[in-house]
Each structure stands twice: as structure tokens, then as C-alpha cells.
């Protein structure tokens, strides 16, 4: 029996095509994935992300616990509401999950983890919390709606109360604030401005309808995937998992190496990998016909004249750019060009930073 979010009936009202997503009945699209994608790049779209898992970590050791649990350092968060992104690693520096952590008070942090990894994440967090004075509380009574796009904030403002708008006025990117019954965060998975709104399940349908009434277009998993790939954002299970370390997943920037005495889980293994050198995640662009896809092999000749091989982790046609893009894990000796094997022939591709579109425009 698949799980259903509290917005399931709203999706059916908008003629969503529903699919199974890691045990959840979720909308793939509402008729046109391309139109939904363009709505987010050009206007405003919204996603039901209530399948994501909200976990509150409270207690006198909350900071110390999260400094051990995460490769990024929550001690950097000094202003209430500030958030950071990073990996939760195992002892071998494999990525158990990537997640966002909000600092609310010295004894209260909110962590948002992926739905596909929920059970193993909760088990790992519970296991590692032993010996710390913390309480770990899953919040299944909370739903979440992401509103994204150049007009998303303005359209959301028409739905928020005057008190809520006052509370979030001038809020910088990667912040979250409790405003009335809503937890409103300037985060997202699209490369556009907007909000991720954590809302009590009892109020979620009304919020979704109010946003719909403001002309915010419902968007499904299809558009969510093409948008995040254009933005160069990893998808857990495709671009990284427990067999991949953050240095090989374009997540090196999320590792807080300083202070050197912070012994986060996976640190020793990660230091050894850093010193030895790892593969890296790059962007690929193919302007001729065809679509780059997950698992296609990537070839290039290094400076020493030796053929090297990597693999595409995520690939798609980019609706914004009009040609195919991909992320690929390759040896770090790669240059500016490579070849991808598709339909039993090799096709030339450009190698770029894994960040293709930001705020509606080409980013490379």
C-alpha cells in the first residue's frame, strides 16, 4: 500500500499522473512536464514535497551531536534561522544522505532529510545520538510545499498574512523562520528564488488551493528532476549514495575541515580519500541531437595519452537550454571535452562545471 501525502486529492483534482516514488504516490506531471518546467523558470510553480522527512533535534547537546553527525559544521550557524546543506556520512565517508539543517536556538535544530532514505536515516541518527543529551523527533504531522520561480515570492506574499510577510521580510537565502503556523524557508531544489513552506497537515490543502488561486502552477516529479539537474543539484541514489564520498559528488564545499579537532563521522576516511585523490562530478553538454542518460559511459584521453572512463549519473534534455545536459563521475584528469557512448557510437560532449542554469539563465 503506497503512502499518500495529505495533498493527494488536490493532485487528482488537477488531473495529475500519479506514480510510485519510493513507496509514495506522487504526481509525475499534471499534463505537461515541459510547461511545468518553464513555469518555474519564467513565473511560479509549486511542488508537493510532503514526502520529505522533518526531524527536530532538541536538547542541551543538540549542537555537539550534530557537529559529530554531519560533515558540515552547525557551529558556523550563529543567526537563528540560518541553514546549511551537507552530508551525513558513514565511517567509510560514504554518503548516507544529504540534508538541510536549520539552526533555531542553541538547543533546537530542524533537519530535513530525503524520503527514500527515511528509515535508514532515522535509525542512524538514533544510533549515533546515544550518549548525547538530545531528543530526536520526527514530525509526520507536517506537510511541505515548495513554491519556486521568479514570481514565487510575490505570489506567496498574497497568500501569507500581514504578520507572516512582516516576519520574513528581507530574509536572505538559506534561512527559515516560524511565522504563525508556517515554517517558511528560502530554500529550494530548482535554482530559482522561492520558499519551501512547512505547514501543518490540517492546513496544507487550504494553502495549496490559495497558491493555486494566485496562479501558481502545480508541478510534478518530472519537472522537479529537470529543474534540479539544470541547477546542478544532486539527487540521492543517482548522483551519490553510500558507495560515494562527498569529494566525488561535487560536495567538497560542504565539508568543514576546520576546526581540525572536530571528529565528525567519516572524517578519517575522508581525509585519506582527499590525500589520495578521488574522481569528481562534472557537467556535460551535448548540443547535437540525442539525450544523455544515467549510466552511459564517458571516455576521454588524459594528458599522458591514456584513455580514461567515467559514467553519467544523471542526464536529461534541458528545456531551458534546448539541448541535453548531464552530470558524470569521471577521473579528475578530465579536460574540456569528452565522448559519450550512445547507440553504439561515441558522441562529442563539452565538459563544464555541474551548474547549467541559475535564475533562468545559462550559468556556464
Swiss-Prot record:
GO terms for cellular component: cytosol; glycine cleavage complex. The glycine cleavage system is composed of four proteins: P, T, L and H. InterPro entries: GCS_T, GCS_T_bac, GCST_C, GCV_T_N, GcvT/YgfZ/DmdA, GcvT/YgfZ_C, TrmE/GcvT_dom1. It comes from the Bacteria. This is Aminomethyltransferase. SUPFAM superfamilies: Aminomethyltransferase beta-barrel domain, Folate-binding domain. The glycine cleavage system catalyzes the degradation of glycine. It comes from Shewanella oneidensis (strain ATCC 700550 / JCM 31522 / CIP 106686 / LMG 19005 / NCIMB 14063 / MR-1). It catalyses: N(6)-[(R)-S(8)-aminomethyldihydrolipoyl]-L-lysyl-[protein] + (6S)-5,6,7,8-tetrahydrofolate = N(6)-[(R)-dihydrolipoyl]-L-lysyl-[protein] + (6R)-5,10-methylene-5,6,7,8-tetrahydrofolate + NH4(+). The keyword Cell membrane does not apply. Belongs to the GcvT family. One of its GO terms (biological process) is glycine decarboxylation via glycine cleavage system. The lineage of its organism: Bacteria, Pseudomonadati, Pseudomonadota, Gammaproteobacteria, Alteromonadales. The gene is gcvT. Keywords: Aminotransferase, Transferase. Its EC number is 2.1.2.10.
Amino acid at each position: 500500500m503506497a503512502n499518500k501525502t495529505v495533498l493527494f486529492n488536490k493532485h487528482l483534482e488537477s488531473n495529475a499522473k500519479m506514480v510510485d516514488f519510493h513507496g509514495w504516490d506522487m504526481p509525475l506531471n499534471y499534463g505537461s512536464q515541459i510547461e511545468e518546467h518553464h513555469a518555474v523558470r519564467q513565473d511560479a510553480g509549486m511542488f508537493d514535497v510532503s514526502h520529505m522527512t522533518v526531524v527536530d533535534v532538541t536538547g542541551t547537546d543538540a549542537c555537539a551531536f550534530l557537529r559529530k553527525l554531519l560533515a558540515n559544521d552547525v557551529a558556523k550557524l550563529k543567526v537563528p534561522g540560518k541553514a546549511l546543506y551537507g552530508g551525513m556520512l558513514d565511517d567509510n565517508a560514504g554518503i548516507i544522505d544529504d540534508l538541510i539543517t536549520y539552526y533555531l536556538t542553541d538547543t533546537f535544530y530542524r533537519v530535513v532529510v530525503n524520503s527514500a532514505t527515511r528509515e535508514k536515516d532515522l535509525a542512524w541518527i538514533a544510533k549515533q545520538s546515544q550518549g548525547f543529551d538530545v531528543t530526536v523527533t520526527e514530525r509526520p504531522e507536517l506537510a511541505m510545499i515548495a513554491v519556486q520561480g521568479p514570481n514565487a515570492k510575490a505570489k506567496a506574499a498574497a497568500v501569507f498574512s500581514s504578520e507572516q510577510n512582516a516576519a520574513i521580510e528581507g530574509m536572505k537565502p538559506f534561512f527559515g523562520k516560524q511565522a504563525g503556523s508556517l515554517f517558511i524557508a528560502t530554500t529550494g531544489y530548482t535554482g530559482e528564488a522561492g520558499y519551501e513552506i512547512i505547514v501543518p497537515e490540517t492546513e496544507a490543502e487550504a494553502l495549496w488551493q490559495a497558491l493555486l488561486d494566485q496562479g501558481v502552477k502545480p508541478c510534478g516529479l518530472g519537472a522537479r528532476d529537470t529543474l534540479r539537474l539544470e541547477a546542478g543539484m544532486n539527487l540521492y541514489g543517482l548522483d551519490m549514495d553510500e558507495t560515494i564520498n562527498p569529494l566525488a559528488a561535487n560536495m567538497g564545499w560542504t565539508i568543514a575541515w576546520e576546526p581540525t579537532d572536530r571528529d565528525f563521522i567519516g572524517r578519517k576516511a575522508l581525509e585519506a580519500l582527499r590525500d589520495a585523490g578521488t574522481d569528481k562530478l562534472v557537467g556535460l553538454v551535448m548540443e547535437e541531437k540525442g539525450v544523455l542518460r544515467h549510466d552511459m559511459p564517458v571516455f576521454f584521453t588524459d594528458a599522458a595519452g591514456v584513455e580514461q572512463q567515467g559514467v553519467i549519473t544523471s542526464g536529461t534534455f534541458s528545456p531551458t537550454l534546448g539541448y541535453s545536459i548531464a552530470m558524470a563521475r569521471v577521473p579528475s584528469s578530465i579536460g574540456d571535452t569528452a565522448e559519450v557512448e550512445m547507440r553504439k557510437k561515441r558522441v562529442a560532449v563539452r565538459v563544464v562545471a555541474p551548474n547549467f542554469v541559475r535564475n533562468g539563465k545559462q550559468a556556464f
